[in-house]
Swiss-Prot record:
Organism: Rattus norvegicus
Broad class of the protein's primary localization: endoplasmic reticulum
Protein name: Endoplasmic reticulum mannosyl-oligosaccharide 1,2-alpha-mannosidase
One Gene Ontology molecular-function label: calcium ion binding
Function: Involved in glycoprotein quality control targeting of misfolded glycoproteins for degradation. It primarily trims a single alpha-1,2-linked mannose residue from Man(9)GlcNAc(2) to produce Man(8)GlcNAc(2), but at high enzyme concentrations, as found in the ER quality control compartment (ERQC), it further trims the carbohydrates to Man(5-6)GlcNAc(2).
Domain of life: Eukaryota
Reaction equations catalysed: N(4)-(alpha-D-Man-(1->2)-alpha-D-Man-(1->2)-alpha-D-Man-(1->3)-[alpha-D-Man-(1->2)-alpha-D-Man-(1->3)-[alpha-D-Man-(1->2)-alpha-D-Man-(1->6)]-alpha-D-Man-(1->6)]-beta-D-Man-(1->4)-beta-D-GlcNAc-(1->4)-beta-D-GlcNAc)-L-asparaginyl-[protein] (N-glucan mannose isomer 9A1,2,3B1,2,3) + 4 H2O = N(4)-(alpha-D-Man-(1->3)-[alpha-D-Man-(1->3)-[alpha-D-Man-(1->6)]-alpha-D-Man-(1->6)]-beta-D-Man-(1->4)-beta-D-GlcNAc-(1->4)-beta-D-GlcNAc)-L-asparaginyl-[protein] (N-glucan mannose isomer 5A1,2) + 4 beta-D-mannose; N(4)-(alpha-D-Man-(1->2)-alpha-D-Man-(1->2)-alpha-D-Man-(1->3)-[alpha-D-Man-(1->3)-[alpha-D-Man-(1->2)-alpha-D-Man-(1->6)]-alpha-D-Man-(1->6)]-beta-D-Man-(1->4)-beta-D-GlcNAc-(1->4)-beta-D-GlcNAc)-L-asparaginyl-[protein] (N-glucan mannose isomer 8A1,2,3B1,3) + 3 H2O = N(4)-(alpha-D-Man-(1->3)-[alpha-D-Man-(1->3)-[alpha-D-Man-(1->6)]-alpha-D-Man-(1->6)]-beta-D-Man-(1->4)-beta-D-GlcNAc-(1->4)-beta-D-GlcNAc)-L-asparaginyl-[protein] (N-glucan mannose isomer 5A1,2) + 3 beta-D-mannose
Matching InterPro entries: 6hp_glycosidase-like_sf, Glyco_hydro_47, Glycosyl_Hydrolase_47, Seven-hairpin_glycosidases
Sequence positions bearing Phosphoserine: 101
Cytoplasmic domain ranges by topology: 1-49
Residue stretches of biased makeup (Basic and acidic residues): 138-157
Positions of the catalytic residues: 288, 421, 528, 557
Length: 657
């Protein structure tokens, strides 16, 4: 018998318990999180690094954008009230110093014409910017920062300032040139008749006739293809707009008068009367529009005596005033002349030092002529502020200044090229304009020249040409912009007005260098930027040009300085050098159908490559200075009678010494 089978094992039940530590089970949410982490871990190291880099870059961009937005909001704090306060005023324009019935010679037929309605031209794609607001706390912080910086600068000046003397003359404590008082506003008259800065010159000589012919050729192209527009594009026979205000026409008004082109002047004057309307929704650059438009109108008024130009100048000056509604009173770079909204560029809240310190001649003169003191007060506040700032190096200034804090930015970089050049020029010219009374201006100018000698002056090899380089955080760069060629002329002007004789030695040396910057090029025209060889090397010239810098924009700085050097020294070699440059312009930049074009390559006489643009300063400055350089009459717009703004527009000296 088989034994009975064993009894089956008893059935066991198992219970699974999940300890969640108080957290409820939510189906699959936690599992999904763990799944994402596992997916991340499954990525390669390269993939994870790329994702992290992109995320970091986006976070950084967001942070920088928030800072920029914060700056813009701070900058516009309280702007509504100030803009309303400075809304375009319609103030009575004081008449020119002449009888109502008197008219400039040869203008009776124009002045009697009725004003006609015109078709308004507006630049394409205008952008309207709404005004912004900002917190008061930001403004208070900026104000405290400015106050601390200015206090430090004042303390430094009190300990370091010395009395400067030249040729035995001691500079007295500053005598400010006061703006017109309120009491005088109703009765003030323009102090200078047209005859004070203008007299009919002798008939033009042969070289001057060459300049007149060049101007008429340029003007033919402008009249035919760009009349009433900003700039001529002579190769394509069309035009380009910047502000849509007839920039070339206004810039050339005084040139036509000086060259004796009265018929062309009449036609341009008619356009100004009938078509120049500033009530348009367009942004203009404060600096460029001041030196070209405001300066051009004031100069045309002084030369012709025609009150139309003064009326237009006052209107335009009023429309520029909102640019000064910043927390620091350092003006914005741009202003909409139709809406009155002023602002910094989109990419920064900085203005350049040259821009904010090279509008003073024009605004001061506008106050003097109209009796409206706000123009002069606004720009002189800027001048005093810059004078008091720390961050300079022996009189040299950085290139940028913040409109919110009023402090220099990008410190340690010093140049006499773009963004700083005309600061130094206007120190001297304001001193001359005001009758040599504002010694603070002269003091800053003389100190700056000493700073140039100490830090920026070098000599090239092998010909030992003296040049002005740049300094960046203690490191010298042998780079010189063509713009720096304004300096020899400014130095010579200072010597003419009594500054040290060694300034003339430097002026002569730099003038030779600027001439060689033209002479050593195959076309005889200077590049935009030159680099100088400082070490003896075989087969190396003193002047070297990089491919990106070898263009020529028809700039005036070299011939401007030739004009001053000839006026002061009477050395005819400077006239000869100017004649060579004019011939080079005719040979390599002249367009047969009319006009002159900037070129891409000054080192290729066979293919200079026209850029198809004639800047307004070619007819406003370059040809004007050449005409005056060739004049046999040294009293034609004499250096004791008028001072030229940085766009070559002559303005009268208030109290000739």
């Amino acid at each position: 018998m088989y034994p009975p089978p064993p009894a089956p094992a008893p059935h066991r039940d198992f219970i699974s318990v999940t300890l969640s530590l108080g957290e409820s089970y939510d189906n699959s949410k936690s599992r999904r999180r763990r799944s994402c982490w596992r997916k991340w871990k499954q990525l390669s190291r390269l993939q994870r690094n790329v994702i992290l880099f992109v995320l970091g870059f986006l976070i950084l961009c967001g942070f920088l954008y928030s800072l920029q937005v914060s700056d813009q909001w701070k900058a516009l704090s309280g702007s509504r009230a100030e803009v309303e306060k400075m809304k375009l005023e319609v103030l009575p324009v004081l008449p020119a110093p002449q009888k109502e019935s008197a008219e400039p010679e040869g203008f009776a037929d124009i002045l009697s014409q009725k004003r006609q309605r015109h078709l308004r031209r507006g630049p394409p794609h205008l952008q309207i910017r709404p005004p912004n607001t900002v917190s008061k706390d930001g403004m208070q912080d900026d104000a405290k920062e400015r106050e601390a910086a200015l206090g430090k600068a004042q303390q430094e000046e009190n300990t370091q300032r010395t009395v400067i003397s030249w040729r035995g003359a001691v500079i007295e404590p500053e005598q400010a040139t006061e703006p017109p008082s309120k009491r005088a506003e109703a009765s003030i008259k323009p102090l200078f008749l047209a005859s004070r800065i203008w007299k009919e010159p002798a008939p033009p000589n042969e070289r001057q006739k060459g300049v007149i012919e060049a101007f008429l050729h340029a003007w033919k192209g402008y009249q035919k293809f760009a009349w009433g527009h900003d700039e001529l594009k002579p190769v394509s026979k069309t035009f380009s707009e910047w502000f849509g205000l007839g920039l070339t026409l206004i810039d050339a008004l005084d040139t036509m008068w000086i060259l004796g082109l009265k018929q062309e002047f009449k036609e341009a004057r008619k356009w100004v009367s009938e078509n120049l309307d500033f009530q348009k929704n367009v942004d203009v650059n404060l600096f460029e529009s001041t030196i070209r438009i405001l300066g051009g109108l004031l100069s045309a008024y002084h030369l012709s005596g025609d009150s139309l130009f003064l009326s237009k100048a006052e209107d335009f000056g009023n429309r520029l005033m909102p640019a000064f509604t910043t927390p620091s009173k350092i003006p914005y770079s741009d202003v909409n002349i139709g809406t009155g909204f002023a602002h910094s560029p989109q990419w920064t809240s900085d203005s350049t030092v040259a821009e904010v310190t090279s509008i003073q001649l024009e605004f001061r003169e506008l106050s003097r002529l109209t009796g409206i003191k706000k123009f002069q007060e606004a720009v002189e506040e800027v001048t005093k502020h810059i004078h008091s700032l720390s961050g300079k190096k022996d009189g040299l200034v950085p290139m940028f200044i913040n409109t919110n804090s009023g402090l220099f930015t990008h410190p340690g970089v010093f140049t006499l090229g773009a963004r700083a050049d005309s600061y130094y020029e206007y120190l001297l010219k304001q001193w001359i304009q005001g009758g040599k009374k504002e010694t603070q201006l002269l003091e800053d100018y003389v100190r700056a020249i000493e700073g140039i000698k100490a830090h920026l002056l070098r000599q090239s090899q092998p010909r030992k040409l003296t040049f002005v380089g740049e300094l960046a955080h203690g490191r010298f760069s042998a780079k010189m912009d063509h713009l720096v060629c304004f300096l020899p002329g400014t130095l010579a002007l200072g010597v003419h007005h009594g500054l040290p004789a060694d300034h003339m030695d430097l002026a002569r040396a730099l003038m030779e260098t600027c001439y060689q910057m033209n002479q050593q090029m195959e076309t005889g025209l200077s590049p935009e930027i030159a680099h100088f060889n400082m070490y003896p090397r075989a087969d190396h010239k003193d002047v070297e040009v990089k491919p990106a810098d070898r263009h020529n924009l028809l700039r005036p700085e070299t011939v401007e300085s030739l004009f001053y050097l000839y006026r002061v020294t009477k050395d005819r070699k400077y006239q000869d050098w100017g004649w060579e440059i004019l011939q080079s312009f005719n040979k390599y930049t002249r367009v047969p159908s009319g006009g002159y074009s900037s070129i891409n390559n000054v080192q290729n006489s066979h293919k200079p490559e026209p850029r198809d643009k004639m800047e307004s300063f070619f007819v406003g400055e370059t040809l004007k200075y050449l005409y005056l350089l060739f004049s046999d009459d040294l009293e034609l717009l004499g250096l004791d009678t008028c001072v030229f703004n940085t766009e070559a527009h002559p303005l009268p000296i208030w109290s000739p010494a």
